[in-house]
UniProtKB/Swiss-Prot annotation:
It is linked to Keratoderma, palmoplantar, punctate 1A: An autosomal dominant dermatological disorder characterized by multiple hyperkeratotic, centrally indented, papules that develop in early adolescence, or later, and are irregularly distributed on the palms and soles (other palmoplantar keratoses have mostly diffuse hyperkeratinization). In mechanically irritated areas, confluent plaques can be found. Interfamilial and intrafamilial severity shows broad variation. In some cases, PPKP1 is associated with the development of early- and late-onset malignancies, including squamous cell carcinoma. It comes from Homo sapiens. It holds the Pfam family Adaptin_binding. It is found in: Cytoplasm, Cytosol. Associated with AP-1 and AP-2 complexes. The gene is AAGAB. InterPro entries: Alpha/Gamma-adaptin-bd_p34 (IPR019341). The modification Phosphoserine is found at S310, S311. This is Alpha- and gamma-adaptin-binding protein p34. May be involved in endocytic recycling of growth factor receptors such as EGFR. The lineage of its organism: Eukaryota, Metazoa, Chordata, Craniata, Vertebrata. Residues 197-234 are annotated as: Disordered.
Length: 315
């Protein structure tokens, strides 16, 4: 494994579905390139994440069991994807044995995967309760219930959701593209919220973005209606220091694409990420959604585009 290359550690706690099969699903091919290691049991699959915001070279590292995790692997883990057999009532027991390592790594992305929840084994409620308790996201590869076609805010499911989550992560070796309006997506990955702004592209070239000097006024104007639920939620979370953070982030996001600007952008993202990490997991998502709304309005976004962003609001 090349030194300094971050990895998404992939493992399976099922005897009928391997970590390598999960990687095949993620990469969308059975013709995989694998990096040879001294330990044949551990396999590294190079993957270049290339989207409109950034590119990053990472490894999908398949580790069959926790005893094969070396210090080098542990230092490189920035995402954790684990498959379990939901048809077995004890299906989560093996996954739980990985928790001490996951807590040591503290990856931003942690995904619990199964084919689909099972009433005869691990049902949806039990799986969701486990995920909430331990900070994971549940993804079913073949869910019985798919999002309705007329849903204005459809959630991604299956492998698509796994790929989406890995794309949303801010990898340590990320190379930003010259796109000046990627801030909202970066904030989503920073704070852990899994929503997008409706079904629209978060970056609108024609969308007017305000300079930092005017951002505070814009944010204040958007908050005008005290009876508005969304505004009330934003007001309840934006304290003076956080408000300053949002304004600086907005300024950096809408500023020039030079290296110094991006370095400061990621430094600020890291600071805000560390602050969010101090919150209990149950509160982090709510915090993320509220901060995301305030930030979106701070860069001149249209509030109508974020109506219904919160998971607890009616769509």
């Amino acid at each position: 494994m090349a030194a300094g290359v971050p990895c998404a550690l992939v493992t399976s706690c099922s005897s009928v579905f391997s970590g390598d099969q999960l990687v095949q699903h993620i990469l969308g091919t059975e013709d995989l390139i694998v990096e040879v290691t001294s330990n044949d049991a551990v396999r590294f699959y190079p993957w270049t994440i290339d989207n409109k915001y950034y590119s990053a070279d990472i490894n999908l590292c398949v580790v069959p069991n926790k005893f094969l995790v070396t210090a080098e692997i542990a230092e490189s883990v920035q995402a954790f994807v684990v498959y379990f057999d939901s048809t077995q009532k004890s299906g989560l027991d093996s996954v739980s044995s990985w928790l001490p390592l996951a807590k040591a790594w503290l990856p931003e992305v942690m995904i619990l995967v199964c084919d689909r929840v099972s009433e005869d084994g691990i049902n949806r409620q039990k799986a969701q309760e486990w995920c909430i308790k331990h900070g994971f996201e549940l993804v079913e590869l073949s869910p019985e219930e798919l999002p309705e076609e007329d849903d204005d805010f459809p959630e991604s499911t299956g492998v698509k959701r796994i790929v989406q989550a890995l794309n949303a992560n801010v990898w340590s070796n990320v190379v930003m593209k010259n796109d000046r309006n990627q801030g909202f997506s970066l904030l989503n990955s920073l704070t852990g919220t899994n929503h997008s702004i409706g079904s629209a592209d978060p970056c609108h070239p024609e969308q007017p973005h305000l300079p930092a000097a005017d951002s505070t006024e814009s944010l204040s104007d958007h908050r005008g209606g005290a009876s508005n639920t969304t505004d009330a939620q934003v007001d309840s979370i934006v304290d003076p220091m956080l408000d300053l953070d949002i304004q600086e982030l907005a300024s950096l996001t809408t500023g020039g694409g030079d290296v110094e600007n991006f370095e400061r952008l990621f430094s600020k993202l890291k600071e805000m990420k560390d602050k969010a990490a101090t919150l209990p997991h149950e509160q982090r998502k709510v915090h993320a959604e509220k901060v995301a709304k305030a930030f979106w309005m701070a860069i001149g976004g249209d509030r109508d585009e974020i109506e219904g962003l919160s998971s607890d609001e009616e769509h």
